[in-house]
C-alpha cells in the first residue's frame, strides 16, 4: 500500500541521515553525504571569513580560497566534493566581507518590513521560500537563482494590485 511505502521511505531516509551524522561526529568522511558535506562547506567558509572579515577574498578568488582552505585543513572531502559554501549569506561574506553581508541582509529584509502591512500573502510566501533556499544553497550565484529572485521579487513588489492576493486565496 502507498502509505506503507511512503512511511518506509521516510524511515529509510531518517536512518540514513542519522547514520550520516553519527559517522561524521565519529570522524568519518563526509564525502558524498549531502548534509554532512554542508557542515564541511560552512566550516570552511567561516574559516575564510575569519581571515578576510572586512573585504572578503573578492568574487574572482572564491574558488581558490576554498581550495586553499580545504588543503590547509587537510579536509577528508574528496576533491570532487570540495565545493563552495552552499549558503548565500556565507557566500556573500566570503566574497565581499562582513560589511557587505550586513548590507545584503538589510536589502533583503527591507521589503519584508516595508511590505508587511499590506498583508501580501503571495509576496511573503515567495520571500520565505527564497530565504529558506538561501540557507542551504548559494541561490544568487547562479543565473537561474538570480532570474527567479529578481522576477518574482519585482513582480510582487511592483504589483500593488491586491486583487492578485484576494483571487489567489
What are these regions (language model features)?
Residues 74-75, 81, 95-128:
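Hydrophobic transmembrane alpha-helices and their immediate junctions
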Residues 85-88, 93-100, 140-148:
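Membrane-interface micro-motifs in multi-pass membrane enzymes
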Amino acid at each position: 500500500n502507498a502509505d506503507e511505502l511512503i512511511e518506509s521511505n521516510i524511515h529509510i531516509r531518517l536512518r540514513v541521515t542519522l547514520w550520516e551524522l553519527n559517522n561524521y561526529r565519529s570522524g568519518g568522511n563526509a564525502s558524498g553525504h549531502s548534509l554532512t558535506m554542508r557542515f564541511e562547506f560552512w566550516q570552511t567558509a567561516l574559516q575564510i571569513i575569519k581571515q578576510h572579515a572586512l573585504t572578503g577574498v573578492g568574487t574572482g578568488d572564491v574558488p581558490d580560497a576554498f581550495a586553499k582552505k580545504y588543503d590547509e585543513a587537510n579536509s577528508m572531502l574528496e576533491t570532487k566534493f570540495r565545493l563552495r559554501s552552499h549558503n548565500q549569506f556565507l557566500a556573500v561574506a566570503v566574497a565581499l566581507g562582513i560589511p557587505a553581508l550586513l548590507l545584503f541582509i538589510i536589502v533583503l529584509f527591507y521589503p519584508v518590513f516595508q511590505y508587511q502591512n499590506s498583508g501580501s500573502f503571495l509576496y511573503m510566501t515567495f520571500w520565505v521560500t527564497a530565504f529558506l533556499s538561501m540557507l542551504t544553497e548559494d541561490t544568487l550565484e547562479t543565473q537561474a537563482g538570480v532570474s527567479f529572485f529578481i522576477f518574482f521579487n519585482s513582480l510582487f513588489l511592483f504589483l500593488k494590485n491586491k486583487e492578485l492576493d484576494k483571487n489567489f486565496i
